[in-house]
Regions:
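Catalytic cores and adjacent flexible loops of soluble metabolic enzymes
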Residues: 1-299
Length: 299
């Protein structure tokens, strides 16, 4: 299969990246980050999450962030809404696209959200119904697709079943997440071969963590399988809560550099992206997690 000519990147840094940060980050800093990402040419930015501040204190100001960002025409500003209450809060904040998530691992589902996979999927039914009524689009996430911290390996057929359910419920796209970063290029190709029998390839996305240094190889393997949508995080924000000190999300800057080298169009200005990553890294008081940004700044 030939490589896609164009790739769409889903920027998850402001949500998935910042949610695990221990230090408080101001609404103003979050707004500045989102605006910088819009200006760099990203077409989709996951801005925040409408969850209980008790569980994810870092996401407490998501409604304020949505109220203050400069919305660029043509850019989608999404939010995670894991339950109906979260969806209603997102709706009140003027959010036009939400994401829901399920796990491919029963043990992870029980430990993370305290219910079975089938129970978690059933919880999304009222969200999908309300989203349809209000003209809100819904994106689906499946976590632990290439390994689980509690169960170990996960069968691709299990991932396909969960992805199929999300797609059948009305998720226009389903992102497959290597939550603990143990996936390899071979396993990634097999995963998409199996899942694409249940969900069309053009409706699938890849979400890779770099915990074992495999994210770029897995993205390339996905491209070979015809996948043309990837989630990534500015400056590699977002560590891995299951491997202390290890890197988590793949850095958007590094993915753009890879795609540029392959002649694949993204519409993203790499220099502006690097600057946005350096800015939020300065706010956090640590170096960027992007290898490309580090190499550029050392020149």
């Amino acid at each position: 299969m030939s490589l896609p000519s164009k790739v769409r990147l889903i920027e998850v840094g402001p949500r998935d990246g910042l949610q695990n940060e221990a230090q408080p980050i101001s609404v103003a800093d979050k707004v500045q980050l989102v605006d910088a990402l819009s200006a760099a040419g990203l077409g989709y930015i996951e801005v925040g999450s409408f969850v209980s501040p008790k569980w994810v204190p870092q996401m407490a100001g998501s409604a304020e962030v949505f109220a203050q960002i400069q919305r660029t025409p043509g850019v989608t500003y999404g939010a995670l809404a894991p339950n109906l209450r979260g969806f209603e809060d997102a709706l009140a904040a003027g959010v036009k696209e939400v994401a829901v998530f399920a796990a491919a691992s029963e043990a992870f589902s029980q430990r993370n959200i305290n219910c079975s996979i089938s129970e978690s999927l059933a919880r999304f039914a009222p969200i999908m119904e309300s989203a349809k009524q209000h003209g809100v689009t819904v994106r689906g996430y499946v976590s632990c697709v290439l390994g689980c911290p509690y169960e170990g390996e996960i069968a691709p057929e299990q991932v396909a079943m969960v992805a199929r359910e999300l797609y059948a419920m009305g998720c226009y796209e389903v992102s497959l997440g290597d939550t603990i970063g143990t996936g390899t290029a071979g396993a990634t190709r097999r995963l998409f071969e199996v899942v694409s029998k249940q969900v069309p390839r053009e409706k699938l996305a890849g979400h890779f963590h770099d915990t074992y240094g495999q994210a770029m190889a897995n993205i390339y393997a996905s491209l070979l399988e015809g996948i043309a949508v990837f989630d990534s995080s500015i400056a590699g924000l977002g560590g891995c809560p299951y491997a202390k000190g290890a890197s988590g999300n793949v850095a958007t800057e590094d993915v753009v550099y890879l795609l540029n080298g392959l002649g694949i169009e993204t519409g993203i200005d790499l220099d502006a992206l690097i600057a946005a990553g350096q800015q939020i890294s300065a706010v956090l008081g640590r170096p960027t997690g992007s290898r490309v940004a580090k190499a550029r700044s050392a020149q």
